[in-house]
């Protein structure tokens, strides 16, 4: 994920000007916008997969939980953090930040800090036991913490995980729990290895070795992901530009294909369609593939200016996905709109391809991570290197379609205002 050599970075004045334009347009672009400053930037962000609870002070709001981490660069103690996010329920009156007449506004509150050794690169909750968090840091070990057993503030000066998962020789970012096989955790790192653990297995002195180590990549492994329909299939991607599909039943590669000319930073399997997956690459594109024919992409999404570091399918809409990159933009795409005719006016062409639904420009630095909220459709959280945490939902008028066809004029005006932030 190295920065592209010779690429000119935008100046501070340009960044501030773009942010100012975005901020002025915020009331027109969003139905929800929470911006929360963090003490330290977080490289990771994950919605806890548990049922939201009603907010005690007002049942028209609900409380969701987020997992975050700190990235202090050695300047201070690092922590894994659990936050409460208070947002309006779908039945609450729409409006920026909830109902204007209500004294309760959406907010983020850090509720728990867990001491870790090293900066938190990636943290993911186990689907079958959401309080159990797999944590990759700047060290080679993967930690498991059950935050339900820990107090809100650290009671010890040492890192005390429930399990230490061994097998790697270097740090990394790839981490994925199986939604089918309880306790199965994948990890990919800079040592070119993929480790698989069954954390329900008996450990000796809270240390667990992998049940299998997969090797085949020729460079750093950037990401690993489980197939969303087949419990035995997972994928990996890395700096060797290779997309690899693995099968647990044989512990062998099923496919190994060079699908980009530059590093692949992320992959995501579609949660609805068993054949479709997406990759994010340093070549500035997001590519869509059919598992039955990986030699050529189904479609390439091009709008980012610079490396693309992440891509995630929307868990609530089959044709919607989002991507983020070094251009400080988080873009939402609807591939159902690929091939739609654009209005033949200059503004429409400036807005990008018809499948580009929305471009979020609320961060002043590279976006480190983002996550869709499965319980609240169209709600996304994102964190960036400028210490900002944002929870947001684009205006309904942007994604809503009329029964017969798109509301072309409304969508065009909203998207044009949205793109003015660029």
Pin down the residues of each PLM region.
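Hydrophobic alpha-helical hairpins/lids featuring a short glycine-rich hinge
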Residues: 122-148
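Long, low-complexity, intrinsically disordered N-terminal extensions of eukaryotic proteins, enriched
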Residues: 1-2, 249
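Per-blade loop-tip surfaces of WD-repeat and WD-like beta-propellers in eukaryotic adaptors/scaffolds
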Residues: 86-90, 101-105, 138-162, 169, ...
């Amino acid at each position: 994920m190295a920065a592209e050599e010779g690429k000119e970075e935008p100046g501070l004045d340009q960044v501030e000007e773009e942010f100012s334009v975005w901020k002025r347009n915020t009331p027109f672009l969003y139905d929800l916008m929470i911006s929360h400053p963090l003490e330290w930037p977080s490289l990771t962000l994950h919605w806890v997969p548990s049922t939201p609870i009603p907010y005690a002070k007002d049942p028209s709001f609900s409380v969701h939980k987020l997992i975050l981490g700190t990235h202090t660069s050695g300047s201070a103690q690092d922590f894994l953090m659990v936050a409460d996010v208070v947002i309006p329920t779908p039945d609450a009156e729409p409006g920026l930040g909830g109902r204007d007449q209500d004294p309760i506004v959406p907010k983020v509150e850090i509720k728990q800090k867990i001491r870790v050794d090293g900066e938190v690169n990636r943290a993911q909750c186990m689907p079958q036991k959401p309080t159990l968090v797999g944590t990759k840091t700047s060290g080679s070990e993967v930690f498991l913490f059950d935050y339900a057993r820990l107090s809100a503030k650290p009671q010890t000066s040492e890192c005390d995980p429930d399990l230490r998962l061994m097998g790697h020789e270097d740090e990394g970012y790839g981490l994925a729990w199986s939604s089918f096989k309880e306790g199965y955790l994948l990890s990919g790192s800079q040592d070119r290895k993929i480790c698989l653990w069954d954390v329900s297995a008996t450990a000796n002195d809270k240390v667990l070795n992998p049940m299998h180590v997969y090797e085949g990549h020729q460079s750093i492994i950037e990401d690993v992901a489980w197939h969303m329909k087949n419990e035995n299939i997972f994928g990996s991607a890395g700096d060797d530009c290779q997309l690899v599909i693995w099968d647990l039943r044989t512990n062998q590669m099923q496919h190994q294909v060079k699908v980009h000319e530059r590093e692949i930073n992320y992959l995501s399997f579609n949660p609805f369609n068993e054949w479709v997956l997406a990759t994010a690459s340093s070549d500035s594109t997001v590519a869509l593939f059919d598992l039955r024919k990986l030699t050529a992409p189904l479609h390439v999404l091009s709008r980012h200016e610079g490396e693309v570091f992440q891509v995630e399918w929307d868990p609530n809409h089959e044709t919607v996905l989002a991507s983020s990159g070094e251009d400080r933009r988080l873009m939402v795409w609807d591939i159902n709109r690929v091939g739609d005719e654009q209005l033949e006016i200059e503004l429409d062409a400036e807005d990008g391809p018809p499948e580009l639904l929305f471009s979020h420009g609320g961060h002043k630095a590279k976006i480190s991570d983002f996550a869709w909220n499965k319980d609240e459709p169209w709600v996304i959280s994102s964190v960036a290197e400028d210490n900002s945490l944002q929870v947001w939902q684009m205006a309904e008028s942007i994604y809503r379609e009329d029964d017969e066809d798109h509301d072309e004029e409304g969508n065009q005006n909203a998207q044009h205002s949205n793109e003015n932030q660029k």
